[in-house]
Amino acid sequence: MKQFFKIISFFYLIVLSIALLIPLDLFIITQTVQEEISDNTAFIIHLVLFFILYLLFYFSFSNKFRILLFCIIYSVVVEILQIFTSRGFQIFDIIFNLIGVLISFLFLLYFYKNKRKQREFK
């Protein structure tokens, strides 16, 4: 099962990297749709994308600290690389990426803690 998650994780990472690094002009989105996507919506999208990234890597690899570290570094590196595209660097993107990772981390921590408690009561 871990092998399956590794494949999905790397595929997701590639697609995410492409989506975050290609210029927005290359997306088939009209100017009207781009204007409708507010900064708040974009931040929520970043949060969800990195929530999923951490979740997938969590089930793919055993060293949880390295996964957390990778997601943090990846978030910063991708944002820095956006300086060289027409997208630009935004500190709030990094913040919401990291919030997504943190929420995913806390969600899994809570889930497994409750699962352990349920086993103890049986």
Regions found by a protein language model. Name each.
Residues 1-94, 98-122:
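Bulky hydrophobic segments
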